[in-house]
Amino acid sequence: MTTTVDIDETLREKLPDLDTFTSLHPHLAGLLASAIGQKLHPQLDEIMDHFGNDQSRARGRSGASATPKEAPATSNLTEDTKKWLRPNGDYYHTRSWGEHDDVMVLREARAGQHFVLLYGAPGCGKTALVEAAYGDELFTVLGSGDTEVSDLVGGYSQLPGGQFVWTDGPLIKAAEAGKPLLIDEIGLIDSKVLSIVYGLMDGRKEYTVTANPERGTVRAKEGFFVIAATNPNAPGVRLSEALLSRFVVQVEMTTDWSLARKLGVPTPAVNAAQNLARKLEAGEVSWAPQMRELLAFRDLEKVFGTKWAVQNLLAASPEMDRPMVANIFSRTYGEPASPAQI
């Protein structure tokens, strides 16, 4: 049965203003029709078309050259979007990992002692996901080429009076407390340093603190878990087979462009970032904006305007990639773009 919905003048007066509808999906009427099996009144289609054209004009373009409709901008998260509070007060919005929620995958992996390796570009959400999964329980080590055993295990420090006192490192603290440990940028740490973690990740579940005989052998309590993150394209990254074999769950993390739009990142900025991501994959550039940069763009644009936000993003890009980045943003926004200067 076909139902016609009539929009009379009274209902028109109750409709939100154009600015409110501008943030909505331009195909909202069609989507509703598909969902409830109704034929909506042509007046509503006309109104929705008008809103879509207004959205194009708000971006300073004609309807014909507006952002493609398959990539609409919206700041409204759906009601079923799950989000988890991170220790810093920000929210992490979950993503699908196959048929599962990514936060729940990490929690189940910890319960089953299936160590996890996340890899992807900086800013794509690796650390945010781990913090969302484990919250205040999490211990973290930020790796580099200068990371030493003492940065993981602990070491002696001298007090003002001259005495030396031993302080446990994050690896020992996490093991004894039965908490998760994130080794961030693990690929930059020397494999000889990382070998100290092996005993706590295999059946032994223990580590002998040779630097402090008084500490002796530390045994991991139930709940101890190791998760690592790395950027495989960073210079100097190396992961031994012995280490990789211990991470039975491995996944590449990428920026969720759809989520970026839902979080209010302007569609032109997302489209430009996607274009750069394709060029990054093709080896034409070494950098593309990820979720972190896009959310910063969103916030800065609200304060300083679009042109300023674009210039700031260009200034954050690697110098060797700036001509390509500037070209893409110039074509996307329809005006010349250059990095910020003072």
Annotate the PLM regions.
Residues 1-342:
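C-terminal regulatory/interaction module of P-loop NTP-utilizing enzymes
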